Amino acid sequence: MKDIKKVTLIGLGAMGVFFAPRISEKLGADFRILADGARKERLERKGVTVNTINYRFPIITPDVEGDPADLVIIAVKGYDLEQAIRDIKNQVGKDTIILSVLNGVESEKQIAAVYGS
């Protein structure tokens, strides 16, 4: 198994903010949040506050191409999963691990239908 050096997270709700500070502390600029539109603007302007600490994570948009992430964490609500699957396209390479932290196993099936298992 290859070392995980670059991580992309999509979804900064309850699950996402649990992982984000911890991973960011370890990886710095190699950890980034995938967001666009108003959400991206808000995160760049205000950051995200977790337990009274404000964090400013690097933000990338879905259209950014380049080196794929070693790990993509999907932490969106179930109703946003289809869009998230499309949005992570440029972050996924042949060796990328995709981790879904949504409840249930249906999300894994939907992701595998697009990216393989």
Set out the residue ranges of the language-model regions.
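NAD(P)+-binding Rossmann beta1-loop-alpha1 motif at the extreme N-terminus of oxidoreductases
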Residues: 1-56
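Rossmann-like NAD(P)(H) cofactor-binding subdomain of soluble oxidoreductases
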Residues: 53-55, 60-117
